[in-house]
């Protein structure tokens, strides 16, 4: 138990409490950060793109997520976001394929991480609409060309949101 607490040091209390239940609940898989590998070059961009979602908890199914929500409520441990494999799927969401051919674009964030095939729907859901660019000038040019409709992150972690905020 101590090892789990140390492993999730820096995570919210609710996340640690749920992960302490992992040995008793086969349907608890882990937090998003446990399920992806990222090359050093892309680490800052991916961390920025994920934001708080890096602590989301992946479960096998909705039943496990529901049980863990009840556990958190019963014990007043707080809230957590659960991503059941049986219901979360982000494949096919990105519509502006032409944007991926623009100068300075490295690809969609979900294509720049490694994960097991069974978790690809999760990474597509969380990262499949975020374009990664080399530099902020590339991101600004891209955002303007596509009328500020894209989610864009740079290698240094600058984030441009639809609507134009940076």
Regions found by a protein language model. Name each.
Residues 3-166:
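Hinge-like oligomerization/junction regions that interrupt long coiled-coil arms in large cytoskeletal
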